[in-house]
């Protein structure tokens, strides 16, 4: 009896972790047409579309390859990667995601930054990722399969 209860607890924890990953990853809209997309935050649509300008430059920008520009709408983070080519600065939208006030998760690569409100409708704080963190649909599928395999191994 105890073995079955513990296996159910393990399976439930796998499902919780999988669900957490799924909620953290959900890009909104089409990255090809950023200016035409309205961003969603919880159950409401933000009143404005994604602004492509103005971009905010970091004061401590010293690297020519480090992402140092970002723009936000309310609690939504839009991260951009910056690169230099022949002395000309080029800004590429990399990704954007709903900001989760309880976490510092970002889908941006290492060195990318974004500004976001730590609490809705308050001041903004700097978020910077220290390492690449990406969860794709395929990685979620792997987590799902591992969950099922672990459950089957514990129950059988």
Swiss-Prot record:
Q: What keywords are assigned to this protein?
A: Cell membrane, Glycoprotein, GPI-anchor, Lipoprotein, Membrane, Signal
Q: This chain belongs to which protein, by name?
A: Uncharacterized protein C24B10.06
Alphabetical GO CC annotations of the entry are: endoplasmic reticulum; external side of plasma membrane
Q: Where is the signal peptide?
A: 1-22
Q: How does it sit in the membrane?
A: Lipid-anchor; GPI-anchor
Q: Which residues form the propeptide?
A: 130-156
Q: Which organism is it from?
A: Schizosaccharomyces pombe (strain 972 / ATCC 24843)
Say if the entry is tagged with keyword Membrane. Answer: yes
> Where do we find GPI-anchor amidated serine lipid attachment?
129
Q: Where in the cell is it found?
A: Cell membrane
């Amino acid at each position: 009896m105890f073995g079955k209860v513990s296996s159910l607890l393990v399976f439930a924890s796998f499902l919780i972790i999988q669900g957490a990953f799924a909620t953290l990853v959900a890009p909104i809209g089409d990255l090809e047409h950023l200016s035409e997309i309205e961003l969603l935050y919880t159950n409401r649509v933000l009143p404005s579309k994604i602004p492509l300008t103005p971009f905010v430059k970091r004061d401590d920008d010293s690297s020519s390859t480090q992402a140092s520009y970002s723009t936000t709408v309310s609690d939504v983070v839009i991260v951009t990667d910056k690169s230099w080519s022949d002395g000309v600065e080029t800004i590429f939208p990399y990704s954007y995601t709903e900001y989760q006030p309880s976490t510092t998760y970002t889908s941006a690569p290492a060195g990318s930054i974004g500004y976001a409100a730590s609490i809705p409708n308050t001041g903004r704080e700097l978020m910077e990722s220290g390492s690449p963190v990406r969860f794709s649909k395929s990685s979620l599928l792997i987590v799902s399969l591992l969950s099922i395999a672990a459950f089957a191994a514990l129950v059988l």
